[in-house]
Amino acid sequence: MSHSLVVLPDDSAKPLVDAINAAKRTLQIRMFLFTDPTMLQTVLAAKKRGVHVRVMLNPARRDGTSDNGETRVALEAAKIEVHDSNPEFALTHQKSMVIDEKTGFVESLNWEIRDLTETRDYAVTTEHGHEVKEMIACFDADWARQKFVPRGESQLIWCPDNGRERIAEFIESAKHTLWLQNERYQDTVIIERLVRAARRGVKIHILARPPHTLKKDKLIEGVGGLRIMHDVGAKVHTLKGLKLHAKMIVADHKRAVVGSINLAPGSFDARRELAIETDAHHVVSRLSEVAQRDWDNSKKIDLTDEGLLKDLEKRNAAAVGAEMLVLKTHAKAKVKH
């Protein structure tokens, strides 16, 4: 099977650990957050048995917070080559791995305990030679701070290169159904394509994070995007039990995109991201099954003014949110005073 699927937390970290344990020659890792002790020990063990390991880490979050310091110290102590990600990009949010130049992992998950045990996440593995070579080519280019140009006919989707165009085309090609799982729905081009899909009769199921989890500077775009899609007939829910971290789209139960790309301008324009498109039946079938199960374990997001105010109270930001979003309930309250 050229493509296969790992579902988190259902499958646990075992498929990733087993793959690294099977590495014989080379291991290339690119990660936004790498703090999980099991994954770290597995990589250190690979180095100890003679595997050539290279690791590229994002040095810091947008706010300057660095999470990967202890991991970097441990890797370098084991004589593993570690580079910061390419400073050409605001962040390297890509999560991926290539083993023995034969198998590539395209992931939504960080290598941290939470993403491996508590969040809905996915990884697609590929053994297509041209896809693996392209992943290696990008890794080598970013490692050396050189220009990388994606292959036009590839199933790989890269940001900031062709991500927005490829995701827009994927949505445009849907005929009957679209199932989306993503943290952010903020990019106006993607929102426009989803609106057009709804208007041509595509049934759209959107799983999103609740509004109170959005950062203040993303609140207008995030809530606005969800409201626009709801108003044209898309169903908008939030997952119960698990935290949603996945970035996944399934079209017509025949094709899917999985990777690190949030549907936001920053992801498309300023960050190194990677996703993969697949039509492998066993992969798309399982993604569809998980999407349906998650939908059955979700609840509708109340996008009315009252519903948004109630949700925003969960972070003590109802007043700020009401003011920014021009919510009617807030306006009426001000008149009374």
Segments predicted by a language model, with ranges:
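PLD/PLD-like phosphodiesterase catalytic module centered on the HKD motif
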Residues: 1-17, 36-104, 109-151, 163-164, ...
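Extracellular/periplasmic Venus flytrap/periplasmic-binding protein
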Residues: 157-172
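An anion/phosphate-binding loop that grips the pyrophosphate of nucleotide cofactors and donors
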Residues: 23, 174
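Active-site metal-binding motif and surrounding structural segment of the metallo-beta-lactamase
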Residues: 27
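A charged, amphipathic alpha-helical module
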Residues: 153-155
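Cys/His-rich zinc-coordinating "finger/knuckle" motifs
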Residues: 30
